[in-house]
């Protein structure tokens, strides 16, 4: 939806903006974490004594690391299974294991195989290489916008809630999440509520600060919900949710070693940061709670929210899951997928903030500068702490090798500049199924409105299934089988449609075909390579007698059916 809006605003062809949108989202996935962490680090350095200040380029280094961690880096699965294990196998004379780009996102339940608990744990870099423009990918730059606005609110939190533009803007974005990717609404409503609460606790860090902070937090939480539901009201008036069937309790849990492969590294970086902040409460006179909020810097307080939320997101699929059509073989898949994808973004931001400041700070201490301690709980010796920080940064950088590996495997070799082809996302059809491509061009050039076109029903991840509806935007009788099942949760209707589509293409009963054409208000029949492959002998002679052939290209033709009712 967002991509099409930008397409129309820019007067650009949709076949071009598909690839432009991929690069647009990927670019913002670097630029926005860079901007956020750059500002957080700049604010963290304010007010330090001259002897405490670290190098001027620290905000840039932290921002660059954040952009890299969110948009380019992979996870530790790549480092272990694509680098360390193959190296050991090579040195010991064993056959070297291969590594395929989805391996890093299909680990729990796949290696080793557990048919009853297959899971998904994707991250932005994988989606960018894959060419994915699903809602969770498009929403990457929007959730990063939310995180940026939240930090801006926390820094400038003054005045009553209804005077704060950030609350209204956040409500609008949350309303967009309700109809674009509801998972992000649930995740970021918690993130926002946590930030508002801690921000208000800092703002009212004097007696009786808790009652004031809670009062304004509750008001803002309600305002946020009201704004979100108001913004999404047109959607909810017509939307019927049949995808979710409730909440389930997890019966099969992730093996400890697999959990460590995926999440031990970010936890080892971020948990000491949390411990260091919480331990600092005990350093204040009489251990007064309000003194902690009065003294803590905004970047650290905001970072605390992000780390705690990220930790919650990776542990939640170990306890509960949202029930959907995958429940029998992959009950946790969708829940883990959507939650950990956002955890990865938050961890990426915070690992950059923590590691860069911690490492440079400890190096300065080794050189004799008496700097403030950002995280006291890791190691006591500054030299060992410096070495630990450097090693952690190198480990983070090593995960970036996943990008090169993924690109090389997905595109059968790393793309070279002189091998550039085109931005046109439909160009591959011209060489693969040129007759179909010509017929699709005819539809785009000659058909207006939204008449229904019949094509072969689709199956998941096939090369050219549903290529007509996808490349023209025209509705068809049945799209991808599993996706239609997930969205509508009505297998009886779906199976009936699948059978009816096959009947239209293969039946020799003209009255039966006419009845189905009228039932689905079909205006055009598309007969091409996929239909011939899927249904074998198509009764082309009978179908052409039902209407007029308006386009013929080689073995492909489009029939405008005379008995069909237009759905313009």
Identify what each model region corresponds to.
Residues 10, 125-126, 130-132, 136, ...:
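Membrane-helix boundary/interfacial segments in multi-pass membrane proteins
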Residues 10-31, 56, 129-142:
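Loop-to-helix entry region of an early transmembrane alpha helix in multi-pass inner-membrane enzymes
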Residues 20-46, 143-149:
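Transmembrane-helix motifs of polytopic, lipid-linked glycan transferases
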Residues 58-62, 162-167, 212-225, 294-311, ...:
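Membrane-interfacial loop-to-transmembrane alpha-helix junctions, especially the N-terminal start
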Residues 58-129, 409-410:
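Aromatic-rich transmembrane-lumenal/periplasmic boundary elements in polytopic membrane proteins
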Residues 127-130, 168-181:
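Membrane-interface alpha helices of multi-pass inner-membrane proteins
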Residues 214-230, 287-291, 359-407:
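Signature aromatic-anchored transmembrane alpha helix within multi-pass, membrane-resident enzymes
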Residues 390, 394, 402-568:
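Extracytoplasmic
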């Amino acid at each position: 939806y967002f991509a099409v809006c930008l397409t129309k605003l820019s007067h650009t062809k949709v076949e071009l903006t598909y690839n432009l949108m991929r690069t647009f989202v990927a670019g913002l996935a670097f630029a926005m974490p860079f901007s956020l962490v750059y500002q957080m680090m700049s604010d963290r350095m304010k007010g330090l004594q001259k002897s405490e200040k670290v190098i001027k380029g620290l905000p840039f280094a932290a921002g660059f690391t954040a952009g890299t961690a969110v948009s380019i880096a992979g996870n530790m699965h790549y480092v272990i299974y694509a680098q360390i294990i193959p190296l050991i196998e090579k040195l010991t004379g064993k056959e070297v294991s291969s590594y395929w780009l989805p391996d890093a996102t299909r680990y729990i339940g796949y290696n080793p195989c557990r048919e009853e608990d297959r899971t998904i744990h994707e991250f932005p870099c994988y989606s960018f290489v894959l060419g994915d423009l699903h809602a969770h990918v498009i929403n990457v730059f929007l959730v990063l916008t939310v995180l940026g606005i939240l930090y801006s609110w926390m820094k400038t939190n003054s005045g009553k809630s209804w005077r704060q533009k950030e609350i209204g803007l956040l409500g609008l974005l949350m309303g967009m999440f309700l109809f674009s990717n509801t998972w992000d609404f649930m995740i970021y409503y918690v993130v926002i509520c946590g930030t508002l609460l801690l921000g208000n606790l800092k703002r009212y860090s004097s007696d009786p600060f808790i009652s004031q902070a809670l009062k304004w937090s509750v008001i803002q939480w309600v305002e946020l919900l009201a704004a979100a539901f108001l913004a999404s009201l047109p959607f909810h008036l017509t939307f019927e949710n049949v995808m979710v069937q409730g909440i389930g309790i997890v019966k099969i849990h992730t093996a400890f070693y697999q959990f460590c492969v995926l999440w031990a590294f970010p936890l080892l970086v971020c948990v000491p940061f949390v411990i260091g902040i919480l331990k600092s409460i005990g350093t204040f006179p009489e251990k007064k709670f309000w003194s902690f909020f009065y003294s803590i810097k905004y970047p650290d307080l905001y970072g605390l929210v992000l780390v705690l939320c990220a930790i919650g997101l990776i542990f939640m699929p170990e306890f509960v899951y949202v029930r959907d059509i995958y429940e029998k073989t992959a009950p946790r898949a969708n829940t883990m997928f959507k939650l950990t994808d956002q955890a990865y973004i938050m961890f990426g931001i915070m690992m950059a903030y923590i590691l860069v400041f911690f490492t440079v700070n400890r190096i300065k201490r080794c050189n004799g500068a008496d700097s403030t301690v950002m995280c006291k709980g890791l190691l006591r010796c500054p030299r060992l702490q410096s070495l630990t920080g450097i090693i952690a940064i190198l480990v983070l950088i090593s995960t970036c090798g996943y990008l090169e590996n993924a690109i090389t495997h997905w595109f059968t070799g790393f793309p070279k500049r002189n091998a550039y082809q085109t931005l046109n996302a439909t160009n591959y059809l011209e060489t693969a199924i040129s007759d179909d491509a010509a017929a699709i061009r005819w539809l785009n050039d000659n058909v207006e409105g939204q008449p229904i076109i019949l094509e072969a029903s689709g199956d998941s991840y096939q090369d050219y299934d549903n290529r007509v509806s996808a490349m023209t935007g025209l509705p068809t009788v049945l799209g991808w089988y599993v996706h239609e099942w997930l969205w509508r949760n009505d297998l009886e209707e779906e199976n009936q449609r699948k059978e009816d589509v096959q009947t239209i293409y293969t039946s020799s009963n003209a009255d039966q075909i006419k009845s189905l054409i009228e039932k689905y208000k079909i205006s055009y029949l598309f007969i091409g390579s996929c239909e011939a492959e899927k249904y074998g002998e198509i009764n082309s002679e009978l179908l052409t007698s039902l209407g007029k052939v308006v386009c013929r290209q080689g073995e492909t033709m489009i029939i405008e059916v005379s008995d069909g009712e237009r759905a313009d």
